UniProtKB/Swiss-Prot annotation:
UniProt organism field: Thermoplasma acidophilum (strain ATCC 25905 / DSM 1728 / JCM 9062 / NBRC 15155 / AMRC-C165)
Name by which UniProt lists this protein: Cytidylate kinase
First and last residue of the signal peptide: none
HAMAP family (alphabetical): Cytidyl_kinase_type2
Catalytic activity entry: CMP + ATP = CDP + ADP; dCMP + ATP = dCDP + ADP
Length: 188
């Protein structure tokens, strides 16, 4: 089984993916880690690499094609990233698609803590990054990243701890699979 976990900045994608991996034993592939590593290799910050990617679509294509190839070649995996669900959907890859949701303020606080910066700086960075990503993905793939209709489950991460969220997701996948409710939606 393939599981994709998507969500906006600070929604808990990486943390929940790690917890779900602990429960399932599945390997986690993080497109965010790959994107950050590519930026680092180019001696750029994430923000600079986002700006670079706006005029160099090959940067996004490279990241997304790597993610797609990994999904196609592997099973029993968790693929975590902003576009993970969309990449599986657009490429007809059978996957259980999860979207993690949190309010803007919660995401902002989490992002500031993760980056070890003040709230105002976090707000500026988060808004620039999300605006850049939304516009790039619309131009590159014709998708609206705020369209949640492709997801099998949307989870609010506000009020549960990551281990609880992972258990909830694992239980929902198991329940839907056993009842044969889960029929992955594949774009044709």
């Amino acid at each position: 089984m393939r599981i994709t976990i998507a969500g906006k900045i600070g929604s808990g994608k990486s943390t929940v993916s790690s917890e779900l991996s602990r429960i399932t034993g599945y390997t986690v592939y993080s497109s965010g880690t790959f994107f950050r590593e590519t930026a680092r290799k180019m001696n750029m910050s994430i923000e600079d690499f986002n700006v670079y990617s706006e005029s160099h679509p090959e940067a996004d294509y490279y990241t997304d094609e790597t993610q797609k190839a990994f999904m196609q070649a592997n099973d029993n995996i968790i693929v975590e990233g902003r576009l993970a669900g969309w990449i599986s959907y657009l490429n007809g890859i059978n996957a259980f698609r999860i979207f993690l949701y949190a309010t803007y303020y919660t995401r902002l606080v989490r992002f500031a803590g993760r980056e070890n910066i003040d709230i105002d700086s976090a707000r500026d960075l988060m808004e620039k990054r999300e605006k850049s990503e939304k516009e790039r993905y619309r131009k590159l793939y014709g998708i609206d990243v705020d369209d949640l209709s492709i997801y099998d489950i949307v989870v609010n991460t506000e009020f549960m701890k990551p281990p609880e969220i992972a258990v909830y997701i694992a239980n929902r996948i198991d329940e839907m699979s056993r009842k044969d409710i889960f029929t992955p939606r594949i774009l044709r």
